[in-house]
Each structure stands twice: as structure tokens, then as C-alpha cells.
Amino acid sequence: MSEQNAQGADEVVDLNNEMKARREKLAALREQGIPFPNDFRRDRTSDQLHAEFDAKEAEELEALNIEVSVAGRMMTRRIMGKASFVTLQDVGGRIQLYVARDDLPEGVYNEQFKKWDLGDILGAKGKLFKTKTGELSIHCTELRLLTKALRPLPDKFHGLQDQEARYRQRYLDLISNDESRNTFKTRSKILAGIRQFMVARGFMEVETPMMQVIPGGASARPFITHHNALDLDMYLRIAPELYLKRLVVGGFERVFEINRNFRNEGISVRHNPEFTMMELYMAYADYKDLIELTESLFRTLAQDVLGTTQVPYGDEVFDFGKPFEKLTMREAIKKYRPETDMADLDNFDSAKAIAESIGIHVEKSWGLGRIVTEIFDEVAEAHLIQPTFITEYPAEVSPLARRNDVNPEITDRFEFFIGGREIGNGFSELNDAEDQAQRFLDQVNAKAAGDDEAMFYDEDYVTALEHGLPPTAGLGIGIDRMVMLFTNSHTIRDVILFPAMRPVK
């Protein structure tokens, strides 16, 4: 047996012994009828206590004679004979308990408290005071075991080191990792901030189907499921776009939805098959209006959630305070590949030659617009570090966007980039039903030619357009990627509570 295997075997034995001892303690508690009581009520959380009383002097606290009730998980314990110090962790953080034998009911300290384990959930009552080192603490007069933990916590000094274990056992990650807890608290604040921002601008939050007969609104490979009652194959949605625009046809002129999308594609540091998007649609607006709205949204969230418009990310600092850069797709190609002759991007053979020279395999089904987009992705995207809007996307890769009035080969569309990755996609919506029908047919032909991500023909949506869609602009923002930026997280799994994982065999 190797040294590593031997160590692993020893750890399993230690865990089994630890769990056996804890189960024996639980059995004893069951005999006493008190393993999982549900009659303890707290009146403060740790963060509330620190916010209210950290600034007070020891003498002032003593004079105030404040009694509080707290509850949480026992993370550390230092037993020093007749007295002990405990670190209690709750949703707000940590608070120290001072537990003295003579200040508790008879028998509680020796017969109960000293037999409890780290990870157990406790309820405590007592008076606030400050230790000689100035730490806010609770001098306990009542201490109760609320939940017996049968498994030990991760090592208190090293936490949960295995990255896979952090994702599979997120509950342990949240218990032992302050950074992880703060990431998901920030995510919650971002979502609340988005909703507040949107409602303040007259948008109505709605919900649209997660299972669809025809998946639409994006170019992606869908998940397929089966509806037994209808005996019908259905698709988990890849985007809510076509349903949201039906609502605009119906007269809801400003709508948004924050919900999950599903795309049956690869998993990477930037991609999870199940992810959260915010999509909005705004009647009597164009893509330029949404560029302004997007810039305002990100600037507002940075200031309100983080308290600054200077957001650190790795070695970079994103500046949301100054105006965001705006480039056309071709300008971006020229900027990051200066040797490009712009005229070559107007010619199929010349553009194909450029693409192949930088390692892009050009598929037979691609037209000029797709080739130029692939060149942009290859030479420019990774360099778009500071907040940047890219405009003038080819119509070929924008089947739902309105054609530009001056040049019908491009659309009134933008994508928003930060940190070298796309965060948002918006455009003036195509509201010409006949043009939309033809573009759907083009997508059907592309699918027949082997493009698995090409869109389906959605006849019902074309029918909706035939009733009249007002001039409208729409925007989609990837919430997970947004949270990555605001929390300095470098893999999407760090900002999704339960990311997709292969089952453990």
C-alpha cells in the first residue's frame, strides 16, 4: 500500500470512529428526550450584535446590562477547567461565548457542554461584555444543544481544500469558507439590486415557460424531455426571448425576467449547462437606449453593492465610473490585429483566408458574416478587459435582430464585454414578420447543413409578429458572469451554489 493510500485509509478509520462516538452521544440524548428541540428563539444575530455594540467601551456595556439570545454552530471551543470560550457561527458571522461552570444550571457544564462536539448547533443566552482584549462576547447563563452533528467539520485551519468537494458538498463549503459565504451574499444583493433598478424604470417582472415545444431565442443545443400527459417531446428553454416579445405584442411595454436557461453544451470555467439570465424588453426604444441602460445598471450595482465603481478582478481593476468604450466589430478586429485590411472583411474569400491564417476552421455553411464574427472572437474578445460595447454584428449571426437602415448586412445589435468575456447581448428587435420568417428559414437550412445550434422555425412567434410588435429593444445579461466580476471569482462554479457535476460512482 502506498503512503498516500495508507493515509487515506487512516482518515476513513478516524472518521468512522468519530461518527461512532457522536452517534453514541445522540443515543444518550434520545434516552433523555432532548436531541432536537425546537423551542429556542434568538433575538439577535452576530452581525447585529457587532454593528450595535462593538464601538461601546467595556464599562458602558457593563452598565447597560444587556441580555441577548443567540443561536448557531459551535466552530471552536477552548476548555480551561471551570470555564471555556466558544466561537459560535450564524448567518451574520461569529460571536464569542464565555461559558463558566458556576453560571449555568447544575450539571450543564460537565455533564452536557463538555460532551458536545464541534459542529453542534447551540442556543445561548447571556449578558454582553468585553474581554480584556476588547472582544465582544456573551457571558452565558443558559446553554442548550439544539442539533447534534453526527459528522465532524472540515479541518478548522485548512477548511475544505478539495475543489470538487466544495462544489459537491456546498453546505460544508459555506460552513467553513467565509469567502464562499460572502460570494453568495453578494450574489443575492446583486439580484435584489437588479430588480430594484428595473422596477424603478417602469419594468414589470414576469415568468415565461421553462419547458417549450420549440426552443428559441438563442443559438444553442437544447435539452430534451418528455411530457407524459401530453405524450409530447419538449425542450428545456435556451432563452425566454420569444415569449417575452409575445408579451410586448400583448401590450406589456416594459418586461423583464430573471430565471434559469438550459443549454446542452460543454462545461468550463465560464459555462454551466444550467445558468441564470436576466432578459428585458422595452417598447419604443432601440439598441442605443439599452447601451445607456446597461452602463447605468452596472455602474449603479457596483456603487450600491460594493460601495465603489473601481472593482478589482485578478490583476485588473474594472472602472465602471468612466464612460464605457464603444467599438464596431470591425474596429475591434483592426485594433487588435492592426495588419488587417478592412476591405478584406467585405470579401468572402479574403475573410476566409484571414480566418484560416489564424487557425479558424471555416465550415461550408458559413457565410461572410459568420466568418467575420469568428475572426473577432479569435483576435479581439480576450483583449476587451475594461467595459466595452461591440456593435454592428452581421445579420447572419443575429437572426432575431433588426437590420441596420443604412447597411442591411449588419444589425442594430451590441454585445457587452468585461474581462475578456461577453456579459450581455442586446439589439433593436426585428419586428418585420416577413423578414423574421425568412431568417427562420435560413436557420432551418443551416440546421439541415449540420449546424446543431441553429434555431427552429417558430410559426406561432411569426403569427404574433403579424399582429404587430412595436419598435422594441431587448437585452440579455448573464447573471453568473456578472457575479463572477463583482466577487473576483474566476470560475463559474464558484458563483453557482450547486453547479453541474458528474455523479460520484
Curated annotation (Swiss-Prot):
Mg(2+) 2 binds at residue 422. Coiled coil: none annotated. GO terms for biological process: lysyl-tRNA aminoacylation. Its EC number is 6.1.1.6. Binds 3 Mg(2+) ions per subunit. GO terms for molecular function: ATP binding; lysine-tRNA ligase activity; magnesium ion binding; tRNA binding. PANTHER family: LYSINE--TRNA LIGASE, CHLOROPLASTIC_MITOCHONDRIAL, LYSYL-TRNA SYNTHETASE. This is Lysine--tRNA ligase.
